[in-house]
Amino acid sequence: MMMNLDELADYEIIIDEDILMSLFKRNGTIDLQDIQKMLDSHKLPKEIRNLLKKIMKMENNETRKLKPIALNNHAKMGLYKKGGVFHNALPLLLESTSIAMDKQERQVMFFNRMNLPNRKMIIVSASANKKLYQGYFPDRRIIFHTIHKAEYQGKVIQYSAHTMSRKCIEQIGADTVFDKIEKITGKIPVISFKMANKGDIYFGKTEGFDEYCGKDIAVVGTPHSKPLFYKLLACELGYIKKNVSYTLNCRRVVRNGYDFKIMSFADPDIQNLQLFLIETDLEKAIGRSRVLRKTCTVYVFSNYPCEQAELIQTEYLPEINDEEEMKCEEIGNA
């Protein structure tokens, strides 16, 4: 994807990955105080000032589609010359196609859509989600061919008694959590949240690493994103309806052959988006061991059931007052 997209116009394109995961990462944030500083400087063109004023008037958790304002290099240099008040993230904000207001964190989240060449494309992926591709490419003809998934040569053993969300780990204490896990798995590499400081590979940064190939590893955590991030992507995909409140609650879902409870949205489209992102992050982490073709063991500690996993619901952590865990504690076969 590093080539100029125009150079691909005459080619049939084959992508050996779920390209949506890369496209969904085209997001960022800008602090409200930085937007206000730019407005106070009175150095921005009228069109940009008017847009920033509208953004500052948004309600908390509000999402909005935008018509991008494309800036060429000459226009960007002109803004830079107007003084240091110009924020580096401004061009990305102006070129974004959807935004979300987060007044709790005092920032605006934005998403910048990338349109792929209007050519025949073949995407080969075990995680591709038809509904999401139809949402991202509404004007393209999408044809899905489902093939039987290969069985793992290795094993996935999943301990699902605890949510293992960031909040769960923080409440118990990371040292306590990982000490308890090490007693189960032995001393093996761990992939978890970045905050856990368990190495260079963590949720959101698992692609391109092969150092755990054939090794036993532990995958620790349920990689939820901020609810507002799901709403931002949902806005881009056209799922958001006016005057509807989209909130997380403990809900029973049926997915991938499992019937389980998890903190999720009532709207089926946004729920599908959320669960896709969670399970894809988990599966990518599991895949670092190459368990598909190597006789290794991956231990997963999460309440989100993974495909081909042997589920163990024995408790392994101290009792905590985890509201999510008290509500969402059941997993079964669908």
Residue ranges: model-predicted function:
Residues M1-A334:
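ASCE RecA-like P-loop NTPase motor cores
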